[in-house]
Amino acid sequence: MAYTNSPLVKYTKLSPNHSGKRTHSIDRITPHCVVGQLSAESICACFPAGRGASCNYGIGYDGKISLCVEEKNRSWCSSSPANDQRAITIECASDKTHPYAMNSNVYKSLVNLCVDICKRNGKRKLLWLGDKNKTLSYIPKSDEMVLTVHRWFAN
């Protein structure tokens, strides 16, 4: 499969923190709260060499989207190598305290980015199953993408 990156990206700073080419096709999207009202640029700056973490995209507090790891490569985001091999991972600016709310700019950009990812990967449905075991055992059909969440994989 030929991988492409989102045309919605307004800033690129590629992190060296990734495992190279994916070993699984993209059939998951894993958003995550970055726990701070960071800019798109600041999100990419969180992943210098040696940090041991990264994401494919970041969405800043103003809704601006950044590219941190190209879609063709597996990021180090969800605490699960198996999930990261098949997921586009997205760090989203959020409040620092529970419930880690995203503002409307971030949420709108997240929805637009998810639509773009699905379209570019030939997916017509984005599924939220809401249950860890159900989601992780689900085998997506060729036109489906599944949402996963970081807390399902975190230590």
Model-derived segments and spans:
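N-terminal catalytic cores of peptidoglycan-degrading enzymes
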Residues: 1-84
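Basic/polar, cationic surfaces and motifs that engage anionic cell-wall
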Residues: 1-12, 18-23, 96-155
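Structural preference for beta-strand elements that scaffold enzyme active sites
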Residues: 28, 87-89, 146-148
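Cell-envelope and extracellular/periplasmic
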Residues: 35, 71, 81-99, 115-119, ...
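Short C-terminal domain-edge/linker segments immediately following a structured domain
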Residues: 59-64, 87-89, 119-124
